[in-house]
Curated annotation (Swiss-Prot):
The keyword Iron-sulfur does not apply. PROSITE patterns: ANK_REP_REGION, ANK_REPEAT. ANK repeats lie at residues 84-113, 114-143, 145-173, 174-203, 205-233, 234-263, 265-293, 307-336, 337-366, 367-396, 398-426, 427-456. SMART domains: ANK. Pfam families: Ank, Ank_2, Ank_4. This is Putative ankyrin repeat protein R634. It comes from the Viruses. It comes from Acanthamoeba polyphaga mimivirus (APMV). Disulfide bonds: none annotated. Keywords: ANK repeat, Repeat.
Length: 486
């Protein structure tokens, strides 16, 4: 291979390596290796060497460094990367490469950086040999707020959990967080062991049951329920999270155990509808849950509805699930009262649902202008077109559709509205002034072109635009219309 190197000039080999982005070519012999200081490939050669366990390459570079009579560019290049050895320590703690960690330590890596986080990664991934090595290097068992059992529980290594507890690690830190993480990742045997050791399944308002339900671990849910007798099903969101994530069997199990379907006025069926889980919705409907128009109050942002008059069908519309909407209509859900679903579909950009609702006989006259306003505010051009073509008034509410489009910076919608009769001078030239405030030169030029009055721009407007830092539009006004700050 040495002879091959000399078949071409160095400059050609550099171009070949740069073009192919193939670092391995540099490792074929020392002649090619010396090109390392000349190439411009994206890959970090030092990183490539370490991650592939080419320690003999590092030994070679180390020997070059010892030769004080000559300067080798590759030595300097490798030295640039030795200040970041700890990130490779973390990688090897995760992948379980103890020998590589030892080599990094011999090169000067500090395994205790960032409050012994390397220890956590080794524990999380179940590498006992690395754990013991790090402890021998002074790592603190109680660093990072004594979270080692949490890490082992998260990673699912029962033997590591047992060992840590046997040497005094806290398995109940932060209100039984290790138990919750074991529930989250589905490690039933660790859950059982922690409970046997004294972990409380009721901690954090039954968060372990809620977490297992959310993640779909039916076996863990059953085990936890069997270990508690005081669940307040009136306020337990386990079934709601199970419904949200399409875990039908868990929903059924929790209902059989007494879960309250009317929690927060029916958020269980709402989250199932919003996320498109038709089987769960059908199951809940079979139990008699109301789907009509009703007042609900949900005191948590988890389910996206707060203090609104909301029919369940609105949740299906919000999620864009046409089949769910059709199902609700087929079993009698109201879609005509206040046209709530229609406006909701316009807000969330679901044109096919709008067309379906129209086909089912809703009256466009009632809420079409409101639907137009919300569609403009959200940037849904195709819905705006559909509504205008079906009678929506682009001048409604003193030109509010255009104002909403301007505020959202939706120039395509603004152009469409203007082409259909919207007045760019309405509401004290709001369209132009909003474009100026946002600093959008293209939009400013467009509104002036179609008739916005630049003479309505006051000195106060200019000062406000200046405070906002819109220098480009200010310069345009000055150079084109001689309008400038006084």
């Amino acid at each position: 291979m040495t002879n091959t190197f000399y078949l071409l000039p160095v400059e050609i080999w550099v171009k070949i390596v740069n073009f192919s982005n193939e670092t391995s070519l540099l490792l074929t012999n020392k002649e090619f290796f010396e090109l390392s200081s000349l190439i411009n490939v994206e890959q970090n050669i030092f990183e490539y060497v370490i991650r592939n366990d080419y320690w003999h390459i590092l030994d070679y570079v180390s020997n070059l460094e010892k030769n004080k009579s000559e300067k080798y560019p590759i030595v300097c290049k490798f030295k640039e990367y030795t200040n970041d050895l700890f990130k490779y320590v973390i990688e090897f703690c995760i992948s379980g490469k103890l020998d590589s960690i030892k080599r990094l330590v011999s090169m000067g890596a500090n395994v205790r950086e960032h409050n012994d986080v390397a220890l956590n990664r080794a524990v999380e991934n179940g590498h006992m040999d690395i754990f013991e090595y790090l402890i021998s290097k002074g790592a603190d068992l109680y660093a990072n707020k004594n979270t080692l059992v949490r890490c082992a529980s998260y990673g699912g290594n029962l033997d590591m959990v047992k060992y840590l507890i046997s040497i005094g690690a806290n398995f109940r830190e932060n209100c039984d967080t290790p138990l919750i993480w074991a529930c989250h990742n589905g490690h039933l045997e660790i859950v059982k062991y922690l409970v046997d050791q004294g972990a409380d399944v009721n901690s954090q308002s039954h968060k372990s049951i809620i977490t297992a339900s959310k993640m779909g671990h039916l076996g863990i849910v059953k085990y936890l329920v069997s270990k508690t007798t005081n669940i307040d099903w009136r306020h337990n969101y386990a079934a709601a999270f199970a419904a949200q994530n399409n875990h039908l069997e868990i929903v059924k199990y929790l209902v059989n155990e007494g879960a309250n379907l009317e929690i927060e006025d029916g958020c269980i069926i709402r989250v199932a509808a919003k996320n498109g889980h038709l089987d769960i919705v059908k199951y809940l409907v079979s139990l008699g849950m109301e789907i009509g128009f009703k007042k609900i109050l949900i005191g948590t942002s988890n389910f996206g509805v707060v203090n609104k008059i909301t029919p369940v069908i609105g949740s299906a519309v919000e999620g864009g699930h046409l089949s769910m909407v059709k199902y609700f209509v087929s079993i009698g859900a109201t879609i005509k009262e206040k046209n709530y679903a229609f406006v909701k579909a316009a807000e969330y950009g679901h044109l096919e649902i709008i067309k379906y609702l129209v086909s089912q006989g809703i009256s466009l006259e009632k809420k079409i202008n409101k639907a137009l306003i919300v569609a403009c505010s959200k940037g849904h051009l195709e819905i705006v077109k559909y509504l205008v073509e079906n009678g929506a008034n682009v001048k409604t509410n003193e030109g509010l559709p255009l104002r909403q489009a301007c505020w959202g910076n939706y120039l395509d919608i603004a152009k469409y509205l203007v082409s259909n009769g919207a007045d760019v001078t309405s509401y004290d030239n709001y369209a132009l002034k909003t474009a100026l405030e946002k600093g959008d030169l293209e939009t400013v030029k467009y509104f002036i072109y179609v008739g916005a009055n630049v003479n309505d721009i006051s000195s106060w407007d200019l000062k406000f635009i200046s405070v906002l830092g819109r220098s480009e539009v200010l310069e345009y006004l000055k150079s084109t219309f001689n309008i400038k700050l006084s």
